[in-house]
């Protein structure tokens, strides 16, 4: 289902935990990471499509999350020609997306990447809010920038821990499986440097990647086919 301009209606999902870290999924059989996303089927509302994709790709149910916000309008990105079959390059241009910001109210163990027969991810992790801007494939970077920026105001309103004032490229922390004892030293450092303008620095950390064994005969993602626009090999992940 394409609109008159050649864009497929789609939803994107930013799932955050209590520490304002975002769910970051590794595409099955590939080395690329992205947010959950998927096409809106005929007759579905964006919210209905979001809950369906959330279960299909992450294994979560509506009771595991709370909707914090959504983008006001469609955000669009174009898919490069090398990812599109030649016969539809004049028709299909890319995706137009409504993005949802969800607060995780369930537990990490509720996340099940094998909730369906055709999983999208084979590993996941929690990452600092702005990290995906530098990690996502280039042609999605601008729409990630717009979605994260627009929805960041809801994160600050709904949680007492503010987002990093450095934004993109600044200090960040990814979960390393330990407790928050490092926060005490960070607080003391903040007191020592209060009132001084400090340049942004990059903190290199080790994050925990949760890998699930996914047995599937599904081949690697292929260029988008026109036979069924709502059921591409990559589940509208391009």
Swiss-Prot record:
SUPFAM superfamilies: Nudix (SSF55811). Its cofactor is a divalent metal cation. It comes from the Bacteria. Residues 188-199 have a biased composition (Polar residues). GO terms for molecular function: pyrophosphatase activity. InterPro entries: Nudix_hydrolase (IPR020476), NUDIX_hydrolase-like_dom_sf (IPR015797), NUDIX_hydrolase_CS (IPR020084), NUDIX_hydrolase_dom (IPR000086), RppH (IPR022927). Residues 171-181 have a biased composition (Basic and acidic residues). Residues 6-149 form the Nudix hydrolase domain. CDD domains: NUDIX_Ap4A_hydrolase_plant_like. The keyword Protease does not apply. Residues 161-238 are annotated as: Disordered. Residues 204-217 have a biased composition (Low complexity). Accelerates the degradation of transcripts by removing pyrophosphate from the 5'-end of triphosphorylated RNA, leading to a more labile monophosphorylated state that can stimulate subsequent ribonuclease cleavage. This is RNA pyrophosphohydrolase. The lineage of its organism: Bacteria, Pseudomonadati, Pseudomonadota, Betaproteobacteria, Burkholderiales.
